[in-house]
C-alpha cells in the first residue's frame, strides 16, 4: 500500500532573506503535494525583512520589509546597493493557506523572536534596548540587536502580532524561532537587568 511512514512530512521556505511571490509559493506547494509532503514551514520574518502584513503595526511592512542593499555572496564589503523587499497582505496569506489546504498541506508560520528582529526594530526602534537607529540587514550573520524584554511594550507588541498571526493560520503550531539570540544588549540594558532581578533570575541566562 502507498501510505506514509511519517505523520509530519515537511519543507521549509525562507522568504525573509529572498522574497517569493504568491505564485512562486503556490508552485512550491504544488511540488510538495507531488511528493506527498503535508507541512509547510513558512519563515516569514528575519533581520533581512518582514514579510507578513500586521494591521496594528503597518510599519512592519512599509519600513521593515525593505532593505537598502544586499551583500553579494559572502564578500563582506561588497553590496549590490539595490533596494529589495516585498511582503504578503493578509488576504494573500489567506489565499495561500487555502491553496495549501486544498492539497492537504498545513501552513506553519514562523515569526522569529526575540532575536533575528532587526526588520521589526527598524520599524519600531523603541522595542530595542538601545532605541536605535537600526537598519534592515543586508548581510548574513547574527545581529546583537534583539527585542528588549525589559519593557512591557515588547510583550504587548508580541501579543498583538501573534494574535493576528493566529487568526490567519488554522495550524495548531506556530513557530516562534528562539534561535541565535545574543544577550550582549541585555547585559548592559538597565531595564533588562531590572527584569532579571524582578524575576529572581541569576543572570541573563536564567
Model-predicted regions and their roles:
Residues 1-175, 189, 196:
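Feature activates predominantly on carbohydrate-active enzymes
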Residues 189-191, 197-206:
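C-terminal active-site-proximal or functional interface alpha/beta core segments in diverse enzymes
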